[in-house]
UniProtKB/Swiss-Prot annotation:
Record-given protein name: Polyribonucleotide nucleotidyltransferase
Compositional bias of kind Basic and acidic residues: 654-665
SUPFAM superfamilies the record matches: Eukaryotic type KH-domain (KH-domain type I) (SSF54791), Nucleic acid-binding proteins (SSF50249), Ribonuclease PH domain 2-like (SSF55666), Ribosomal protein S5 domain 2-like (SSF54211)
Gene (UniProt): pnp
EC number: 2.7.7.8
Any Pfam family the entry gives: RNase_PH_C
Length: 717
């Protein structure tokens, strides 16, 4: 039966509906906010796998073009593989939801939020998040919900709940917060150098609405009726010889956990575990049935050792204290032919960033249901398997897209406006080594490579990943976490920014009791770390170079009247093509009359600019041109001053000082002129130049009549 509930969230009602659509799914909710509607469904497989150490969850957010009344562009007129935006929204939904599923359920779970309608004002991603969370909570799949999500913008010193696209564009803060009734579980967003206090206040504002939406879902359960949950595939089991295993292995495992160097440490831990396996197999205490439980017990011991060392001794596996940052080495200009390059190495994490400058033709065109967009800044993050000493396929996965997006948002606010720097900018980050925080290393190397390329960025940007180990009311915040600290810890909080404020952030929390004070402490510690990293980066390069790379394309801009655009283009593009071919430049003409020239030869570009200026310039009496003789007749010659203007050079004298004969005949003149250069009026005829079609001559505008016809006279050198 159809059930509907609504709640005022910001300026619109959030409407949740179930019982009408997709009734064969385990759970289905239709969510509407303003004119944006998303249907979210959740299904699970019939069979389960035992002893999984992960949740087999997949989230497939997708947007239908018909939602905006559009047909897909290109040759294929149906939706294809997921766009980057759909991947990013899928990750937004996945991350806060995944820790709330019980691993013992064992079945594959698929959540599919589908945008069915959009008003192109209210972003459908937040609608899709709440639809997905509600669908799972109402389903028969075991889930420790409810959870909800809210977006906050900060505009004119005021917080806006679930802002419109325009408000997000104008805001200095765009933050998405997800959480449960117990606390915040995820934060992600970008900003324009906001303070830690503003960020915390935005999270507080979001959490008030999150609690209301969670209570709305609980009310929904009361109306619809709580469904009996599907059974767990297995009960939590532990290795029955865990005590003996601990006595046998704990001391050696503890020593292995503190071996210096990631690869050496991993190898040492692996050898200790292998030794334990061989011993317990020999006494028939490990077999196929309990092998998974055996290795899980070893992992539990490792986690216990690492966490206890941090909580009790403030000692991390690589020997650092909680606030200490790994050694940093940075340099620029490694690659000679690129437009800008930088290498940032922090401990065993290394990112090589390369900046390339292109023209407006290189912009990425986005065919999107929210409206077509042109992106003139892109950051692509690559994580090859060799960065962690492994083999594998070289491909771009969801993780790469997500990490690249976070780094891009962190740098974007510091870039110049397109009108001030009309280049297309592409930054590629190659992760060459990885042991935690590679996305923040990308921010650091990307910022330096932009400066090295001569992009006038406002400020240097650095990033740091923060971690957390907690037990009860006690917690220790970690600066610059390792990969294992991310895996074994309770939080991954990435913060990027300048010396003035925060520009990008992403937080995932595995525990439910994260307090405001804890987040405040984490942000304060992150700021100290960020300042330290910025000081090292500034010692290498502290400001953008005055000039762009000699290898980058040059740009010249000029403005013409709108009604002169057709003159520059010419009939069927003839004029602009001639300029392009002759001067080896690209010409970009905007509808507002702004013309941009792209090329590599500065001299040719200046000549192309002069040609365009001459085309659109209004002729004035007395101006001198170097024109081409286009046609000669008995009265004179037609001279092409510009591709769009011609003047007439007459051979008939206007006074006694005008002494030119018929230009088509001999250099001594003809007709009434005598052989000796004197005519019947006793005027002197100089030897005029012989003019031929195609010849270049220097002329001066002597007169312009009321019809715009131009009369010329020769200019003698």
């Amino acid at each position: 039966m159809r059930k509907i509930l609504k709640l005022k969230v910001g300026r619109e009602d959030l409407i949740l509906e179930t019982g009408l659509l997709a009734k064969q799914a385990n759970g289905a909710v239709l969510a509407t906010y303003g004119g944006s509607t998303v249907l979210a469904t959740v299904c699970c497989s019939d069979s389960a796998r035992e002893n999984l150490d992960f949740v087999p969850l997949s989230v497939e957010y997708n947007e239908k073009y018909y939602a905006a009344g559009k047909i897909p562009g290109g040759f294929i007129k149906r939706e294809g593989k997921p766009k980057d935006k759909e991947v990013l929204v899928s990750r937004l939904i996945d991350r806060p939801m995944r820790p709330l599923f019980d691993k013992r359920f064992g079945r594959e779970i698929q959540v599919v939020p589908t945008t069915l309608s959009t008003d192109q004002m209210n972003p459908p991603d937040i609608v899709g998040m709440n639809a997905a969370f509600a669908a799972v909570f109402l389903s028969d799949i075991p889930f420790n919900g409810p959870i909800a999500a809210v977006r906050i913008a900060y505009l004119n010193s005021e917080f806006i709940v679930n802002p419109s696209f325009d408000e997000i564009q104008d805001s200095i803060l765009d933050i998405v917060v997800a959480g449960s009734l117990d606390g915040i579980t995820m934060v992600e967003g970008g900003a324009n150098e906001v303070s830690e206090e503003v960020l915390l206040a935005a999270i507080d504002q979001a959490y008030e609405y999150i609690k209301q939406i969670c209570n709305l879902q609980k009310e929904f359960i009361l109306i619809v009726g709580e469904r009996e949950k599907l059974p767990l595939a297995y009960e939590e089991r532990v290795f029955e010889f865990k005590a003996e295993l601990k006595d046998f292995i704990y001391s050696e495992l503890k020593d292995a956990c503190f071996v210096k160097g990631k690869l050496n440490r991993d190898k040492a831990i692996k050898l200790v575990k292998q030794k334990a396996y061989e011993h317990f197999s020999s006494v028939s205490q490990v077999d196929e049935e309990n092998e998974t439980l055996f290795y899980k017990a070893l992992d539990d011991f490792e986690q216990e050792i690492v966490r206890r060392s941090i909580l009790e001794n403030n000692l991390r596996t690589d020997g650092r204290n909680p606030t200490q940052i790994r050694d940093i080495v940075a340099e620029v200009d490694l690659l000679r032919r690129t437009h800008g390059s930088a290498l940032f190495t922090r401990g065993e994490t290394q990112a090589l960033a390369v900046t390339t400058l292109g023209t407006s033709i290189d912009e990425q065109i986005m065919d999107d249901i929210d409206g077509d967009k042109r992106l003139n800044f892109m950051l692509h993050y690559n994580f090859p398997p060799f960065s962690v000493g492994e083999t594998g396929r070289l491909m771009t996965g969801r993780r790469e897209i997500g990490h690249g997006h976070l780094a891009q948002r962190s740098l974007e606010a510091m870039l110049p406006k397109k009108d001030d720097f009309p280049y297309t900018i592409r930054v590629v980050s190659e992760i060459l080594e990885s042991n935690g925080s590679s996305s923040m290393a990308t921010v650091c190397s990307g910022s330096m490579s932009l400066m090295a390329a001569g992009v006038p960025v406002k400020e240097q940007v650095a990033g740091i990943a923060m971690g957390l180990v907690s037990e009860g009311d006690k917690y220790v915040i970690l600066s610059d976490i390792l990969g294992e600290e991310d895996h074994l810890g309770d939080m991954d909080f990435k913060v990027a920014g300048t010396k003035n404020g925060i520009t990008g952030f992403q937080m995932d929390i595995k525990i439910s009791n994260v307090t405001k004070q804890l987040m405040k402490d984490a942000l304060a510690q992150a700021r100290i770390g960020r300042m330290h990293i910025l000081s090292i980066m500034d010692s290498v390069i502290s400001r953008s170079r005055d000039d762009i790379s000699v290898n980058a394309p040059k740009i010249i801009q000029l403005q013409i009247d709108i009604d002169k655009i057709s003159l520059v283009i010419g009939s069927t593009g003839k004029t602009v093509k001639a300029i392009t071919d002759e001067f080896e430049v690209r010409v970009q003409i905007e509808q507002d009359g702004r013309i941009t020239l792209f090329g590599t030869d500065s001299l040719k570009m200046q000549k192309a600019k002069a040609r365009i200026e001459s085309i659109v310039r209004e002729p004035k009496i007395g101006e001198i041109y170097e024109g081409v003789v286009k046609k000669i007749n008995s009265f004179g010659a037609f001279i092409e001053l510009t591709p769009t203007k011609e003047g007439f050079l007459s051979n008939r004298p206007k006074s006694r000082d005008d002494r030119y004969g018929d230009m088509r005949h001999s250099r001594y003149g003809s007709g009434r002129h005598s052989r000796y250069g004197r005519d019947s009026r006793n005027t002197f005829a100089m030897r005029p130049p012989r003019l031929e079609e195609g010849q270049m001559v220097k002329v001066r505008i002597s007169d312009i009549d009321k019809f715009g016809k131009i009369e010329l006279e020769l200019v003698r050198d």
